[in-house]
């Protein structure tokens, strides 16, 4: 996996005339270096983060790593490529990066970066004397698209950990339980089962009875999702839209289901699930290598009677890997031309998450992860829809 990822990055760098990548994003650093590290609060992922520098003519990346307790010590990166941490939010850290790049990057070599801190922007002319850096997404995005067998295995393991932890949380649902209690139980069990990091603040959102009764303003006038978990106590009959993600060895799970406190589901709510299932089945029927994002979006819209079965500020589906949501993102404001021109390769992974809504039901949303194959797909998600489904 380490060697394959490096080869893909360097081949794409050669194609685009890029001498060096400077990577700050956690997911990009994981992909380029194989490094993973424990993290409980995803909101602190920018604190003491590693930085990677990938050179087009070096088979190993350089990693500037704060080796905290519990960090992955089984690095495939050679010892002479592992350096003390850089704190690029500060001028001192940027000065150290400037010296490192001067030593590593050939004079005049083009550099691409995935993000720039304020301190990096102030020193941009010194950091990148050959000219403004290009966007590293043009290299990292295509490299990450097709998953290796090892990467699929890591994502599958992350999903199994997530599902086992989620099952314990679902069994604990009862009136009087707080949303934060659910988060605590999930995170504790996930780490006991071998999770490396907690990727997002767990969502156990209690859905309003109508679109306009949620008391949260949105620019689209539609449902607000996600809302932060609080100490709110659950009530009998509450409909919860759930969304959680952890990593295993740097690769993400993505879990979403709709639950009901008390497990009593009305006929209208069962009907919501059945329509959601029809939409998912229609999308899966056209999912295979060679299909496009547009094919899946049109199948979903047709199955939903001509309207989009996803929230306007989100998407019908997205990729997954070292980030919980990666390209492609289907049905966004990138537009129909983007969707129709994005062709699925075999080995790509996709998270499908259609949404159906009818006032008075709490709606229905779930997530399904698949691997694209030449003639269809292989399912990764393995979790029941209970209490929904009449059969």
Show the residue positions of the predicted features.
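Active-site neighborhoods and metal-handling regions in enzymes and metal-associated proteins
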Residues: 1-391
């Amino acid at each position: 996996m380490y060697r394959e990822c490096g080869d893909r990055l360097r081949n794409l760098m050669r194609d685009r005339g890029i001498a060096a990548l400077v990577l700050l994003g956690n997911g990009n650093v994981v992909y380029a270096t194989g490094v993973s590290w424990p993290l409980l609060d995803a909101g602190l992922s920018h604190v003491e983060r590693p930085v990677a520098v990938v050179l087009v003519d070096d088979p190993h990346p350089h990693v500037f790593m704060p080796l905290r307790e519990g960090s992955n010590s089984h690095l495939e990166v050679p010892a002479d490529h592992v350096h003390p941490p850089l704190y690029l939010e500060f001028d001192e850290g940027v000065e150290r990066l400037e010296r490192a790049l001067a030593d590593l990057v050939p004079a005049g070599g083009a550099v691409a970066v995935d993000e720039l801190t304020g301190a990096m922007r102030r020193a941009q002319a010194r950091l990148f004397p050959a000219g403004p850096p290009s966007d590293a997404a043009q290299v990292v995005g295509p490299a990450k698209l097709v998953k290796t067998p090892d990467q699929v295995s890591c994502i599958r393991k992350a999903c199994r950990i997530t599902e086992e932890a989620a099952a314990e949380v679902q069994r604990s649902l009862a009136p009087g339980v707080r949303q934060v209690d659910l988060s605590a139980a999930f995170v504790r069990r996930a780490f006991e089962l071998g999770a490396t990091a907690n990727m997002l603040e767990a969502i156990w959102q209690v859905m309003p009875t109508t679109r306009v009764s949620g008391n949260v303003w949105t620019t689209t006038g539609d449902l607000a999702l996600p809302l932060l978990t609080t100490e709110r106590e659950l009530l009998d009959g509450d409909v919860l839209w759930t969304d959680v993600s952890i990593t295993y060895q740097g690769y993400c799970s993505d879990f979403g289901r709709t639950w009901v406190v008390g497990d009593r589901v009305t006929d209208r709510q069962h009907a919501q699930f059945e329509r959601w299932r029809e939409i998912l089945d229609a999308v899966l029927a056209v999912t295979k290598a060679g299909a496009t994002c547009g094919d899946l979006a049109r199948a979903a819209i047709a199955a939903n009677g001509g309207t989009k079965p996803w929230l306007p500020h989100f998407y019908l589906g997205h990729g997954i890997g070292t980030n919980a949501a990666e390209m492609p993102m289907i049905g966004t404001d990138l537009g129909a031309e983007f969707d129709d021109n994005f062709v699925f390769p075999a080995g790509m992974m996709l998270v499908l998450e259609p949404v159906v809504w009818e006032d008075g039901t709490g709606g229905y949303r779930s997530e399904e992860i698949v691997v694209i194959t030449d003639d269809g797909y292989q399912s990764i998600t393995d979790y029941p829809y209970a209490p929904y489904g009449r059969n």
